[in-house]
């Protein structure tokens, strides 16, 4: 330590002068200086130990005194009531009240004259405390104090922090009369109840007749109710049954559901239709992404109607004709933002509507064709006839085994390559199912044909005829919640 910190300049460092001065005075002896302070304490251990024990023994409550000197939140009436109720015979002398308060609350161990005077005032001025004379047999002085029997409930819920009201003797008869009035009405109604029951049977029978007729008059409901006999016993037994069947079987509860599904021209939206679409898809070409979309997206389908996709997919068709491949990809990307919420409506399209849509080769020119384009982009309707119809603008007469078309210009593919870099990872997201390859495609047709032909174990068809670069690195069951790329997001979350 002396080598590092020089003794000549003790003010060189802010913390060191104390150490350097110590070393300066101890420089003559090596470490003998350390033994002398230890000897001071070790030579007289009994003196300090005994002194500490004796000094703290009589004042064992003093360390907690600063915390306990806060005045308790109880009134003097509450303190007196506590003392009386804790007494064995529910009566206690004035000195007993003082002792109880001092034992329970250290705050009252000081200034005894002030608070004890307040205790005496409260005992004499409040009518809830009754003075009981002392028996001559028991030694001692001072009378006992007890609580008036009618004042036991003067505190709310047994809490001494709040009193209901000031107890007065003249209020006791009024309270007793009120209690008597409260007890009488149940007995009178119980006596009058048997006389009123035959009168009440008539309305119950009428209600039962109305319920049975309304259920039978609705032809669209398959609910069959059992008609009971209209005897008083039968009416009483059948009324719970009819009351419980009205929410489920009456036209008020179930007909609005059918009418709500009717304006869209779609079948009733339910879990059964989704499960049947998932288990038996049309044509058997439903890709895993589409099957997953049918299960993930449905809660978002209810607030939207079937008409809005036509308004959003018209710009997609114009971008397809005007801007070529790059504009088409961008517009399809933008359209996936709008059609992400309406998608389940396309998943539930009935087969009759599919056939009607497949007869119109115009594609996005009509609203129905635009609706089907959005459904085809989703990948839920994966038949080959539909996807040929969607891309009629690029290949009007393309047979299924199409030869390799001329490749698109390089700038277009480079500009759109950042959409397609993580295609294999994006294939599990419903909004980006069209970008399924990790390499850039030579043309737009292969990019949109490859993912619709079933990516599991089925043949890839046209997309593999063209070149060997279309070997899809598709994972069989990608996890639903995996984040694929920094720019990817799931439209169903918003």
Curated annotation (Swiss-Prot):
Expressed in the brain, muscle, heart, fat, kidney, lung, liver, uterus, ovary and testis. The modification Phosphoserine is found at residues 214, 218, 231, 239, 250, 280, 287, 366. SUPFAM superfamilies: Winged helix' DNA-binding domain (SSF46785). The keyword Transferase does not apply. Pfam families: Forkhead. The keyword Phosphoprotein applies. Residues 70-161 bind DNA. The modification Omega-N-methylarginine is found at residues 278, 292. There is a cross-link at residues 183, 213 (Glycyl lysine isopeptide (Lys-Gly) (interchain with G-Cter in SUMO2)). It comes from the Eukaryota. Signal peptide: none annotated. Residues 385-394 have a biased composition (Basic residues). Keywords: Activator, Developmental protein, DNA-binding, Isopeptide bond, Methylation, Nucleus, Phosphoprotein, Transcription, Transcription regulation, Ubl conjugation. Residues 166-213, 233-267, 381-422 are annotated as: Disordered. This is Forkhead box protein C2. It comes from Mus musculus (Mouse).
